[in-house]
């Protein structure tokens, strides 16, 4: 950066999104049948993942990117201690985890559920191999950790987060390949760009891909009647 001073990677100076790195647009070609119909148009430049970086960003090594992101990250919310029981002069404290998941992250998730390509993907994944309720809850958790404004999350972020969740939770590599099969079919040319954007998202999350069972429950408890929580893989015979 020209000034030599590190800035938080997701702090925007204006309501306009950054145009440094634009995520590819996923569109549906209705004339092509089968699950490979959606594809990512290679012509437009990918939209920003929220990283305000110089134009030479893509030429930096992964180590340099990690070091710069480490300097630019905003402080994480700190855990607090609350009184659990009080008996006479004795007091028992319980550590309360500071959750980074906000209502706006649920709103961004719900907005993307209305996207026609996302809806088609969820309907296509009949066996819930890559979109059961736990993996979808992890998408919300990842949205909270990436640090973007809710309006910045686009269709590609949903698939990037779902890929990371599957990579974290599934031993089988096949479910992740299902995402590629749906988005690109047999076209392999777009996969390197997908992995580049995946790496950017992973860095913005500080590599925190594990989501605790408590956080899973908290995310689902925000709207327990939401239809996505009925996507339970264990109930499929």
Curated annotation (Swiss-Prot):
Record-stated family: Belongs to the Speedy/Ringo family.
Region called Disordered, residue ranges: 1-61
InterPro entries: Speedy (IPR020984)
Tissues in which the UniProt entry reports expression: Predominantly expressed in testis.
Entry's Gene Ontology molecular function annotations: protein kinase binding
Listed name of the protein: Speedy protein E4
Highest taxon, organism lineage: Eukaryota
PANTHER family (alphabetical): WBSCR19-LIKE PROTEIN
